[in-house]
Amino acid sequence: MQVQKSFKDKKTSGTLYLVPTPIGNLQDMTFRAVATLKEVDFICAEDTRNTGLLLKHFDIATKQISFHEHNAYEKIPDLIDLLISGRSLAQVSDAGMPSISDPGHDLVKAAIDSDIAVVALPGASAGITALIASGLAPQPHVFYGFLSRKAGQQKAFFEDKHHYPETQMFYESPYRIKDTLTNMLACYGDRQVVLVRELTKLFEEYQRGSISEILSYLEETSLKGECLLIVAGAQVDSEVELTADVDLVSLVQKEIQAGAKPNQAIKTIAKAYQVNRQELYQQFHDL
């Protein structure tokens, strides 16, 4: 067990700060984020050129260290050594929250394993920002990040998740969004979705409707900018009628194969299909 008192403990090691950056509008940069970036010894940036423009805008002279998915495992030991020596680091992504669809998570784990304090600053996050304005149920929700580019893997993913009652969120390229929606329609049926693009920018747009309606709209409209797709969860009532024809134990096993612990997998499937969790637990362990 580990207890971190972020601002009370007196340690010789430095602190790792996770600093969110604007997702499109520079006015969303917080006073605390600017102050932190000025005070730390180094900034670990996903793209030093992109972050350099941000630093210049806010008159921040702190030295940058390149840290991205292609050099993360090589750089992490050196960054941990800096933190152990007493230097403080800030990690930023190109836009939004660090660790969300970028390599920050591995650095955070390494810092925690080395008993180094990790402090996250609140700020811009595309998923939550879009979700609360989408009109779809904000809780429960689940964020999956970027989908596979391969149609077969994407369809298999949707088949596994089609029964989930949670609102689902994905990042997607404007060049692949029509193919993704087509695959989703085949697996999920014609659910309500919200397609969000250019979030916080001048041309911010929310497209709300069924999957088929959005697909029809996209046939006549070109898309630019990264997209965020928010999808309504499965309707519980319609799913309950199907439980007699569904092998719930197999679904539990799929969840476990995907990385879930057995008890969590049982809980997820029991909730999705509105069955007694203890009974499903017994079925699973009787095999």
Swiss-Prot record:
Q: Give the subcellular location.
A: Cytoplasm
**Listed Pfam families:** TP_methylase
Q: Name the source organism.
A: Streptococcus pyogenes serotype M18 (strain MGAS8232)
Principal localization reads cytoplasm
Q: Which PANTHER family match?
A: RIBOSOMAL RNA SMALL SUBUNIT METHYLTRANSFERASE I
Tell me its family.
Belongs to the methyltransferase superfamily. RsmI family.
Q: Which transformation does this protein catalyse, written as a reaction?
A: cytidine(1402) in 16S rRNA + S-adenosyl-L-methionine = 2'-O-methylcytidine(1402) in 16S rRNA + S-adenosyl-L-homocysteine + H(+)
Q: Name one GO cellular component term.
A: cytoplasm
Per the entry, what this protein does is: Catalyzes the 2'-O-methylation of the ribose of cytidine 1402 (C1402) in 16S rRNA.
Protein name as annotated: Ribosomal RNA small subunit methyltransferase I
Question: Keywords for this entry?
Answer: Cytoplasm, Methyltransferase, rRNA processing, S-adenosyl-L-methionine, Transferase
Query: EC number(s) on record?
Result: 2.1.1.198
Identify a single GO molecular function assigned to this protein: rRNA (cytosine-2'-O-)-methyltransferase activity
